[in-house]
Amino acid sequence: MIIYKNVDYGIYAYQIGFFKVKRIGEIVWSDHYDSKNEKFSLRIEGFYVAEERRRHGLGRKLLNKTIKQNLNENYPYMIVYPKTFGEKILKDNETLYRIYEHLGFYFTEEMVDRTKADNEMRYDFIVKKKRRKFLYRTNFFSYL
């Protein structure tokens, strides 16, 4: 199995398959501008793993590959496309919510208007800063 990257019109994708013959998994993402926070984030447009290949960690592998590539871009978080999580879809497909929750996403709800709520699943990028160890070296010229 190989993971290969596909870029088309600002939409990026990682696909996992057998030598580009049979696709068994895919994650598709794009840039998203959040006007409230005035920051760019990643937005997952699609996430797919073939039914016979589920429960083997392929979804986690695709998500980790996406996160590793985009950590250097200073995105604060990643969201799942909000239209996916409308009230009707969440009631009908509880497993979709559980899958994203298992991968580390959490459900947020913000009020856009008094009558309309904006639902999304969010994954925060938490980068642990490594402590730098400074090596104290003796000056070479002090021995001369």
PLM features per residue range, with description:
Residues W29-S30, V49:
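GNAT/GCN5-related N-acetyltransferase fold signature
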Residues E38-E51:
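Conserved acetyl-CoA binding element of GNAT-fold acetyltransferases
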Residues I2-I27:
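Conserved beta-hairpin
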Residues T84-E109:
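Conserved active-site alpha-helix within GNAT-family acetyltransferase domains
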